[in-house]
Each structure stands twice: as structure tokens, then as C-alpha cells.
Amino acid sequence: MDPNIMWQARNDGSGLLEEDIQQLRSSIRGTVVLKNEASEEEYNAAVTRWNNVSIRLATLVVYVEDEQDIVKCVEFVNKHYLDVAVCSHGRHSYHGASSSTGMVIDLGRMRKVSVDKEAMTVTAQGGCIARDVELPLEAEGLAAVFGAVNETGVGFLTGAHGLAADNLVSARMVLANGQVVTASDDENSDLFWAIRGAGPNFGIVTEFKYRVHKQGPVFWQMLFYSPDKLKDCVSIVNQMHNISLAQKGGDFQVMMCYLTPPGYPDLHPGLRIFYNGPEEKAKELAAPAYALGPLSVSGGMCSFSDTTRIPPYLEFEGFDRYAASSAHLDYPLDEDLLLEVFTMFRNVIHKYGHHLLHPSKCILDLRNYEKVASVPIDATAYSGRFDVAWMIPDLQWDDPAMDSTMRMEVTSITAHIRERVREAKGDHVSGPRDATAIYPNISAGGEEKAKSVFGPNLPRLRVLKRKYDPNFIWNKWFPIVPA
């Protein structure tokens, strides 16, 4: 059956009777917020997201308290054939955690964490945010790799330890039929393979168990340069990446950004330096960046958890509407193309003036992905196992009337990059990837994008989708059509 027809056929919940809602409420410990019953304040709080573009007006939102609540919600969804979305904390630029019809299952109250220092693991419930896990780990001198865990999870420890998905030991899940299972190398190994990259297609994880690592203080510094040094910054990006690769432990990581820092009237290039070690060594490795003469320098030695906080130069009141896209670039990076892209981004910023100027940014991710690339492409569902750079234009604005325009502008930049990559490659494809491969955290949405994210693993995923979700209940993020 066509997936769009399968989704559209789902009930929006408007026909639910009062007795249906009462039955749901009496079966769970959590709270049901009903669109036409709750106060405006209560309902708005239930559907608000970090990205206001992602707000959808669901018929009901259920704040679950435990795993059994989730089971009852899934049973209710099946009984009434409702559309359903799952919200862990709602902090994502895409709207996969929202539903314009049916039910949202909100995991935000499920935030328990336990650390097993002897086994070097941490167990965290599905509603946890990064700091819920980072702080108890930090107290034990430990850390884990974190990122957008509904897909793969990339962080500044990825160079040393791989993706969050590569450090997943096991997961407890509620499947589409309401069954609770454990997925690991030893139990339901096919499901475990699938959720490491395609998790939103297969169920709701109530509990993750991750491998953790010993962790001390790190060096974390942001260098901003005057606008006229954009070309100089671009001229050292290949050198900085090569320095990162030379550190075999993956401890030295660099990112470039192009944004308007607080107190400045226009875009400035910047380099973010991370080193999992002492300041003296960090500055030695990053010498080319300091030699350019930064306009300002902030940061230094800090705890690892400090690196995951939103930095002051990205904190702005309002501007709570987001659009981001991504495209990969092969090394050695084409400096002329990078300057083209930064110029396109600057033109967009200047075109829309005060709507975009301060919070918007363009990021060039130069982090070392050799550890990620060392894992065979068929070892997990995620197929993006290669060491490339990622260009990520990210626009923020505050006027809802500009939503579609901003989405068009941001995707036009990455479309240009992909076209240039295609031109450079011609008909040649290196291994299992192609010129359209995308960064899943940024480019969620739609079956076509699923093909790019999962590549040669998609046929197997479609077979597993038929096994674990034949009725296409889980149809958000990167919806995989059952075989």
C-alpha cells in the first residue's frame, strides 16, 4: 500500500468519544492533555517545540510516566487507528516530534539515569536530555558520546569513540504492537541493527544503555576573526583537518563557523577548537588558527559538559524559528567552493536584514570522522561511514510569514553544493555513497531522504519494517516503507 495513503488513512482523533479519553486516562499514570478541553496555556505548553516552525496542533498529548504508560498509549493508537508522534524533549529543527493530528506521546517525564562504573555503562530513560546523563557521569570522571540520538549521535567525543549509536549496548523498546522487547547484540539482534541509525521507524525506546569512557577536563575555545579574514580562515581548513587526522586518538577537533557575534554589526568567520587534553598541547596543534590573529578569543580549559551548552554567542531572545540543511564535501576541500557558499549565505543574511542577522550561522564541520568510517557500512543501519566535511547553513528568524521562504533559501545553498559535488565526481561514485548523501540530524523528512541516509542498507530495513511495523505506525523522521 502507498505510504502516503497509509498515513492519510489514519484517524485524526477528532471522533474520539469522552468515554474513550476516560478509558485512556484511567489506564495510565500520566497526564492526557486534550486539545478541545485543556486551557490555552496548558495546551500550548504541550505542543510547543524548540523550533516554533515544528509546532503542530495534535488532538491529544500524553505525558507518560513509565514504560507501561507507553504500552497503553500504543494500544490506544492501534485501537483507534490514530496518527502518532513521539516527543523526547522536542529540541530539533525538524517537526518529527509533532503531529498535526492524532496523538503525541511525550517522554519528557521519563528522565531517570543510573551509572554502573564497574561495567562502564550508563542507563538512561528515553526522555533524558544530555545534561541529565552528563552530570552524573562527570561526577564519576566519565563521559558518553551524545548527539541527536534518535538517529546516530555525533559529538566532540566521536573522533575518539565513534557515534552514540556505536556505543549503544542495548535498548528497551515498545514496538508498534505494544510488545516490550530488549534489543542488543544478543537479543533481537536484527532490531538492534536497525535502531542504530533508523530508530524512529521501529518503536519507542524507553531505556538506553550506553558504553561510557573515562573523561577529564578538556580545552574548548572559540576564535573569531575580522570579516576580511574569511579567505584566510578558509585557506587553513584542510591543514587543520590534517592535523586532526594526525592525532590518532581523535582528540583534536575543529569546526568553522560564519555568524554575527554579539556586539558586532556583520558576519565574522570563526574557528571552534576542541582538544581532549591540556591547553598547551591544544594551542600547539591549533597554531595555524592563532597565527591568523583572531579578533576575540573565549573559553579555555573546562569540564566536558560545558562543551555541550549553548555558547553565549548563540543565545538570542526570540528568533525561535529554524531551518537548516546540509551537504557533504570531500577532502581536500575546494576552497573556491567554500568561499562561494559563504558568499551565498552572506547574501541571504543581507537580503533579509534584521530578520536573520544575529542568530543565523553557517557551519563547516571539520571534525575527524575516521573512527566512524572504520565501522563497516553494513554493521548498522546508518550508512554514512566516511570521513567528509559537512556544510550546514542554519537560518533563524522570528516572523512566521517567512517560514517557507527561509526553508527555500537554506536548501538552495545545499543544492548548489550537491550540484558542484556531482560536477566534480561526474558519473563516478566512490564506494556505496553518492553525491547526495546527507547529514541525518539536519536533513530529516521524507522517503527520498531515507534513501540517501541508509543507502545500500535500505532494502534490509524495508524487510525489517514489514516485520516490526507493517502498518506504518511510525511514519515520522525518515519514514521507511515496509517491503
UniProtKB/Swiss-Prot annotation:
GO terms of molecular function: FAD binding; oxidoreductase activity
**Induction annotation:** Expression is significantly up-regulated at the end of late growth phase, in the presence of Butyrolactone I. Expression is positively regulated by the pgm cluster-specific transcription factor pgmR.
Class in the EC hierarchy, top level: oxidoreductase
Say what happens when this gene is deleted. Only abolishes the production of pleosporalin A but not of the 2 other final products.
- Domain of life, per UniProt, equals Eukaryota
UniProt lists the family membership as follows:
Belongs to the oxygen-dependent FAD-linked oxidoreductase family.
Q: Write down what this protein is called.
A: FAD-linked oxidoreductase pgmH
Organism encoding this protein: Aspergillus terreus (strain NIH 2624 / FGSC A1156)
The gene coding this protein? pgmH
